[in-house]
């Protein structure tokens, strides 16, 4: 079972970003590459229980500080204790595992 939290309210996103280890999948329903990434992201959420996995549909959230740098989707961002530590566009499963392993 996936442990991904869908976020659609800016205040909720602000609160969740303060966690120790957070990974966010920014995408959109109309994005083909996002649909390919989604089951991988969901699977990884069950394998890394100490990381908070979030999904944000960029069309359903107001402009947020974290979305200002997004130029392409899917974009994955990693936050540690409220600070962005990494951003990667259209990652594959190997790349995601590597960055998740680096958070340990």
UniProtKB/Swiss-Prot annotation:
CDD domains: TRX_family (cd02947). Gene3D superfamilies: Glutaredoxin. GO terms for molecular function: disulfide oxidoreductase activity; protein disulfide isomerase activity; protein-disulfide reductase activity. InterPro entries: Thioredoxin, Thioredoxin-like_sf, Thioredoxin_domain. It comes from the Eukaryota. The record marks 32-33 as: Contributes to redox potential value. Keywords: Disulfide bond, Electron transport, Redox-active center, Transport. Disulfide bonds join 31-34. SUPFAM superfamilies: Thioredoxin-like. Residues 2-104 form the Thioredoxin domain. The active site is at 31 (nucleophile), 34 (nucleophile). The keyword Transport applies. Participates in various redox reactions through the reversible oxidation of its active center dithiol to a disulfide and catalyzes dithiol-disulfide exchange reactions. Belongs to the thioredoxin family. This is Putative thioredoxin-4. It comes from Dictyostelium discoideum (Social amoeba).
């Amino acid at each position: 079972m996936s442990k991904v939290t869908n976020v659609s309210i800016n205040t909720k996103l602000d609160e969740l970003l303060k966690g120790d280890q957070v990974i966010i999948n920014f995408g959109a329903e109309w994005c083909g590459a996002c649909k390919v990434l989604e089951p991988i992201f969901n699977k990884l959420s069950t394998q890394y229980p100490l990381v908070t996995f979030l999904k944000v549909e960029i069309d359903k959230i107001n402009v947020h500080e974290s979305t200002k740098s997004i130029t392409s989707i899917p974009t994955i961002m990693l936050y540690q204790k409220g600070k962005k530590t990494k951003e990667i566009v259209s990652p594959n499963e190997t790349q995601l595992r590597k960055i998740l392993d680096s958070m340990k």
